[in-house]
Amino acid sequence: MQDPEKFSIESIKERLKERFPKEMDEIIYFFDLELICKFTLFLKEKNEVGGFFSKRDSMEILDRHVLESIYHVYRITKKIGSWKGIQLGDAGTGPGIPGFFFRCLKAYPVVVLIDSQKRKLSHTESFVRSNRITDLKFQFIRTEESKLSLNYVVSRGFIPYPYSVEAVSNLIKIGGTYVPFLGKHDIDVKLEEKVLSYSGFRLESSEDLSSLEFLGMRHIKFLKKISSPRHGYPRTWKDISKESKSGNGKDRID
């Protein structure tokens, strides 16, 4: 569905009611809608200069990026319970999606937006600075080269899963959790087990997000880091990317 003529708290509420009638009240309770509205207006205003979205997605920012992210954050927050004292990273964040929406919670973690390229994220950095938004950090680094030791990491539309696990393996402390945003359940189980094993992770749980069926199939996995990656991992971005493009990995959109 195309975006409303004007983004406002009311127009966002109306779309939330339409898309998530049973969960709308709880979603609104969790989030700072004023901050969501400000960020949504920023995404629209800076879309062309920042190259944030494709031509089609530029007409559906609210559904395909804002509401999708909000709903993921809502479901993850319900499972986690409290973000107090937690640092959460968003790998390959682009303009800050979905990571910024964790900062839009009323009770939020410290959020670290991570991307190796400044083209999109630098605009968000300026937006955060001009609005004096706290507890939001920026890291312009390659994920596989970083050792941030975060409690949680999420990713959306990043390098195809399960190779994304390898790429983020050094971002997360042992005992921490990686939550990739995924599409269909068409992942090679043996390949998944192999990558999780050498990256030091274990599958804890998986949740289908049936309320997002208007966008297609969506699900999330909760992957706990139980050990350091095996020697030689993670590999360079070039090697991970090359193998992931061989047709073995799956991202959230497929």
UniProtKB/Swiss-Prot annotation:
Enzyme type, top EC level: transferase
Q: Which GO terms describe its cellular component?
A: cytosol
Gene3D superfamilies of this UniProt entry? Vaccinia Virus protein VP39
Q: Name one GO molecular function term.
A: rRNA (guanine-N7-)-methyltransferase activity
Q: EC annotation?
A: 2.1.1.-
Q: Where in the cell is it found?
A: Cytoplasm
Question: Can you tell me which family this protein belongs to?
Answer: Belongs to the methyltransferase superfamily. RNA methyltransferase RsmG family.
What this protein is called in its record is Ribosomal RNA small subunit methyltransferase G
Q: What organism is listed for this UniProt entry?
A: Leptospira borgpetersenii serovar Hardjo-bovis (strain JB197)
